[in-house]
Regions:
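Acidic (Asp/Glu-rich) sequence patches and key acidic residues
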Residues: 1-103, 107-109
């Protein structure tokens, strides 16, 4: 997912776990991670400002993302609408998890 890769540095502030045993910083590229209710709140604290920033973007722009662990970067053309819709989806899932006092399970990119 291009947007997740673009904001990946700030998403490393989220603490997740794998199999309730291995603590992770951020989200894995492969496999699953469990996100506690407290960390869901932190996700919202990170995503909402990103959404506000993208609301000020041009209608069409590029996200510059790193290709896997290589030094290579590439530009991915996106629209403001698709970025905002994706972020609103993330916010909706997080809001629902908080309302239900649930954890989230994340499947890698």
């Amino acid at each position: 997912d291009h947007l997740m890769r673009y904001i990946q540095d700030s998403m490393r502030w989220i603490h997740t776990s794998w199999n309730d045993q291995i603590e992770l910083e951020g989200f894995p590229d492969e496999g699953f991670a469990v996100i506690t209710e407290m960390e869901v709140e932190r996700i919202l604290e990170i995503i909402r400002p990103w959404k506000a920033l993208f609301l000020a973007s041009p209608e069409n722009f590029c996200l510059t993302i790193q290709e896997d662990s290589d030094i290579c970067y590439r530009e991915v053309p996106v629209t403001r609408r698709e970025v905002i819709e994706e972020m609103e989806g993330w916010i909706g899932i997080c809001d629902l998890a908080l309302k239900q006092h649930s954890q989230l399970v994340y499947q890698g990119l």
